[in-house]
From Swiss-Prot:
GO terms for biological process: regulation of DNA-templated transcription; response to stress. The keyword Transcription applies. The gene is yfiV. Residues 20-152 form the HTH marR-type domain. The keyword DNA-binding applies. Transmembrane segments: none annotated. GO terms for molecular function: DNA binding; DNA-binding transcription factor activity. Keywords: DNA-binding, Transcription, Transcription regulation. It comes from Bacillus subtilis (strain 168). Pfam families: MarR. SMART domains: HTH_MARR. The lineage of its organism: Bacteria, Bacillati, Bacillota, Bacilli, Bacillales. This is Uncharacterized HTH-type transcriptional regulator YfiV.
Length: 160
């Protein structure tokens, strides 16, 4: 799945200036090209978007309480439980009682799910490595500096 770089109808001209639209297109091109590997590999997992979001949350945060997953997803506890039932049946997550509070249920990725994530990330890492090898040391430094600036700006904008 690739971002349609020629379809600028998705860009709101009242929000983004011409220069900002160009940055957006480049930003999306980088995300789709090098992000987490080939998006088609993720599509092969044949999961709903909410299921994928749960897996991403667990991959990023480790073990989470069911209530925390529901809160982060903006979903009801019953919907979250249904999602977790399907993911557990598919062998992607495992539930257990919290060691701190036995009444609380926690969820984590199974080793199989972790292996899948490692494989998907590895493909993205290899693609990025091959791409960076094509750059001169000066170009790599420029990419690093530009991404550092953008990362700081995105973090600061998130605080507002």
């Amino acid at each position: 799945m690739e971002y349609n770089l020629h379809d600028t109808t998705v860009l709101n001209e009242n929000i983004l200036s011409s220069e900002e639209r160009e940055i957006w297109v480049l930003y999306m091109k980088v995300l789709t090209s090098a992000g987490l590997g080939d998006v088609s590999e993720w599509m092969k997992l044949d999961m709903s978007m909410p299921q994928m979001k749960v897996l991403m949350l667990l991959n990023n945060h480790g073990t989470l309480k069911v209530s925390d997953i529901a809160e982060k997803m903006g979903a009801s506890l019953s919907n979250t439980t249904g999602l977790l039932d399907r993911l557990e049946k598919s062998g992607f997550v495992k539930r257990s009682h919290s060691e701190e509070d036995r009444r609380s249920v926690v969820v984590q990725l199974t080793e199989n799910a972790k292996k899948i994530f490692r494989g998907l990330y590895e493909k993205g890492h290899l693609k990025l490595k091959r791409s960076l090898e094509l750059l001169s040391p000066e170009e790599k430094q420029a990419v690093y500096e530009g991404l550092s600036i953008l990362s700081r700006a995105l973090e600061n904008a998130k605080k507002e």
